[in-house]
Protein backbone atom coordinates (compact mmCIF):
# COMPACT_ATOMS: atom_id res chain seq x y z
CA UNK A 1 0.00 0.00 0.00
CA UNK A 2 1.09 3.56 -0.68
CA UNK A 3 1.15 5.82 2.36
CA UNK A 4 2.90 8.99 3.44
CA UNK A 5 3.98 12.36 2.10
CA UNK A 6 7.34 12.87 0.39
CA UNK A 7 9.01 16.14 -0.62
CA UNK A 8 10.95 15.69 -3.86
CA UNK A 9 12.74 17.77 -6.45
CA UNK A 10 11.99 17.69 -10.16
CA UNK A 11 15.34 17.47 -11.95
CA UNK A 12 16.37 19.26 -15.17
CA UNK A 13 15.07 16.35 -17.26
CA UNK A 14 11.61 16.36 -15.60
CA UNK A 15 12.30 13.29 -13.46
CA UNK A 16 11.49 12.51 -9.85
CA UNK A 17 13.06 9.75 -7.78
CA UNK A 18 10.66 7.20 -6.39
CA UNK A 19 11.27 7.09 -2.61
CA UNK A 20 12.86 3.85 -1.37
CA UNK A 21 9.82 3.07 0.83
CA UNK A 22 7.59 2.95 -2.25
CA UNK A 23 9.79 1.06 -4.72
CA UNK A 24 8.69 -2.44 -3.77
CA UNK A 25 5.09 -1.57 -4.68
CA UNK A 26 5.93 -0.91 -8.34
CA UNK A 27 7.51 -3.09 -11.00
CA UNK A 28 9.48 -1.58 -13.85
CA UNK A 29 6.67 0.56 -15.27
CA UNK A 30 3.93 2.89 -14.10
CA UNK A 31 1.05 4.79 -15.64
CA UNK A 32 0.97 8.50 -14.94
CA UNK A 33 -2.13 10.50 -15.74
CA UNK A 34 -3.89 13.75 -15.07
CA UNK A 35 -5.72 13.74 -11.75
CA UNK A 36 -8.17 16.04 -10.02
CA UNK A 37 -7.36 19.41 -8.38
CA UNK A 38 -4.30 19.96 -10.62
CA UNK A 39 -2.35 16.92 -9.50
CA UNK A 40 -1.07 13.88 -11.35
CA UNK A 41 -1.73 10.25 -10.44
CA UNK A 42 0.66 7.29 -10.59
CA UNK A 43 -0.56 3.69 -10.67
CA UNK A 44 0.64 0.22 -11.56
CA UNK A 45 -0.48 -0.62 -15.13
CA UNK A 46 -2.88 -3.32 -13.83
CA UNK A 47 -4.38 -0.88 -11.32
CA UNK A 48 -4.78 1.69 -14.07
CA UNK A 49 -6.79 -0.84 -16.08
CA UNK A 50 -9.12 -1.29 -13.08
CA UNK A 51 -9.37 2.49 -12.73
CA UNK A 52 -10.27 2.71 -16.42
CA UNK A 53 -13.05 0.13 -15.97
CA UNK A 54 -14.69 2.38 -13.38
CA UNK A 55 -15.10 5.04 -16.06
CA UNK A 56 -15.77 2.58 -18.85
CA UNK A 57 -18.89 1.42 -16.98
CA UNK A 58 -20.41 4.90 -17.29
CA UNK A 59 -22.72 5.28 -20.30
CA UNK A 60 -20.73 6.53 -23.28
CA UNK A 61 -23.90 8.13 -24.62
CA UNK A 62 -23.50 10.89 -22.02
CA UNK A 63 -21.34 13.82 -23.00
CA UNK A 64 -19.85 14.17 -19.49
CA UNK A 65 -18.63 10.57 -19.64
CA UNK A 66 -16.89 11.12 -22.96
CA UNK A 67 -15.37 14.40 -21.77
CA UNK A 68 -14.08 12.92 -18.51
CA UNK A 69 -12.57 9.93 -20.29
CA UNK A 70 -10.85 12.19 -22.82
CA UNK A 71 -9.44 14.50 -20.18
CA UNK A 72 -8.04 11.64 -18.12
CA UNK A 73 -7.04 8.98 -20.62
CA UNK A 74 -5.84 10.99 -23.61
CA UNK A 75 -2.94 12.25 -21.53
CA UNK A 76 -2.15 9.02 -19.66
CA UNK A 77 1.37 7.72 -20.24
CA UNK A 78 3.00 4.36 -19.65
CA UNK A 79 6.45 5.21 -18.26
CA UNK A 80 9.37 2.90 -17.53
CA UNK A 81 11.31 3.48 -14.32
CA UNK A 82 14.99 4.00 -15.09
CA UNK A 83 17.83 2.12 -13.37
CA UNK A 84 17.90 4.78 -10.60
CA UNK A 85 14.12 4.37 -9.97
CA UNK A 86 13.30 7.73 -11.49
CA UNK A 87 10.03 8.59 -13.18
CA UNK A 88 10.11 10.80 -16.26
CA UNK A 89 7.08 13.10 -16.19
CA UNK A 90 5.97 14.03 -19.73
CA UNK A 91 5.97 17.74 -20.61
CA UNK A 92 2.22 17.91 -21.18
CA UNK A 93 1.57 16.60 -17.66
CA UNK A 94 4.13 19.01 -16.18
CA UNK A 95 2.04 21.81 -17.71
CA UNK A 96 -1.32 20.32 -16.69
CA UNK A 97 -0.28 20.05 -13.03
CA UNK A 98 1.67 23.33 -13.06
CA UNK A 99 4.70 21.53 -11.64
CA UNK A 100 7.77 23.53 -10.69
CA UNK A 101 10.96 22.25 -9.04
CA UNK A 102 9.54 21.41 -5.60
CA UNK A 103 7.17 18.43 -5.71
CA UNK A 104 5.05 16.66 -3.10
CA UNK A 105 4.29 12.97 -3.58
CA UNK A 106 1.29 11.73 -1.58
CA UNK A 107 0.35 8.12 -0.95
CA UNK A 108 -3.33 7.39 -1.60
CA UNK A 109 -3.31 3.70 -0.64
CA UNK A 110 -3.59 2.30 -4.19
CA UNK A 111 -1.98 5.16 -6.11
CA UNK A 112 0.21 8.23 -5.69
CA UNK A 113 -0.60 11.87 -6.28
CA UNK A 114 2.06 14.24 -7.61
CA UNK A 115 1.59 17.90 -6.64
CA UNK A 116 3.50 21.11 -7.08
CA UNK A 117 4.50 22.02 -3.52
CA UNK A 118 3.01 25.55 -3.61
CA UNK A 119 -0.23 24.27 -5.20
CA UNK A 120 -0.51 21.56 -2.54
CA UNK A 121 0.06 24.01 0.32
CA UNK A 122 -2.65 26.29 -1.13
CA UNK A 123 -4.99 23.30 -1.46
CA UNK A 124 -4.43 22.34 2.19
CA UNK A 125 -4.90 25.92 3.38
CA UNK A 126 -8.25 26.19 1.61
CA UNK A 127 -9.51 22.69 2.50
CA UNK A 128 -12.24 22.04 5.02
CA UNK A 129 -11.47 20.16 8.22
CA UNK A 130 -11.30 16.37 8.27
CA UNK A 131 -14.38 16.26 10.50
CA UNK A 132 -16.45 18.47 8.18
CA UNK A 133 -15.66 16.39 5.11
CA UNK A 134 -16.19 13.08 6.95
CA UNK A 135 -19.57 14.24 8.26
CA UNK A 136 -20.71 15.22 4.79
CA UNK A 137 -19.60 11.87 3.37
CA UNK A 138 -21.26 9.69 6.00
CA UNK A 139 -24.00 8.63 3.57
CA UNK A 140 -21.80 8.33 0.46
CA UNK A 141 -21.31 4.87 -0.99
Swiss-Prot record:
One of its GO terms (molecular function) is DNA-binding transcription factor activity. It is found in: Cytoplasm, Nucleoid. It comes from the Bacteria. Residues 5-47, 76-119 form the SpoVT-AbrB domain. Keywords: Cytoplasm, DNA-binding, Repeat, Transcription, Transcription regulation. CDD domains: MraZ_C. Disruption phenotype: Probably essential, it was not disrupted in a global transposon mutagenesis study. Its main location: cytoplasm. Transmembrane segments: none annotated. The keyword Transcription applies. The keyword Transmembrane helix does not apply. SUPFAM superfamilies: AbrB/MazE/MraZ-like (SSF89447). GO terms for biological process: negative regulation of DNA-templated transcription initiation. Forms oligomers. This is Transcriptional regulator MraZ. It comes from Mycoplasma genitalium (strain ATCC 33530 / DSM 19775 / NCTC 10195 / G37) (Mycoplasmoides genitalium). The gene is mraZ.
Amino acid sequence: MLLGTFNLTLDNKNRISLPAKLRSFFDSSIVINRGFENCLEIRKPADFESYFQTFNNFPNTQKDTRTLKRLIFANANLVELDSANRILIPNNLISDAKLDKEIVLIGQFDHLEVWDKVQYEQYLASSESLETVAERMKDAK
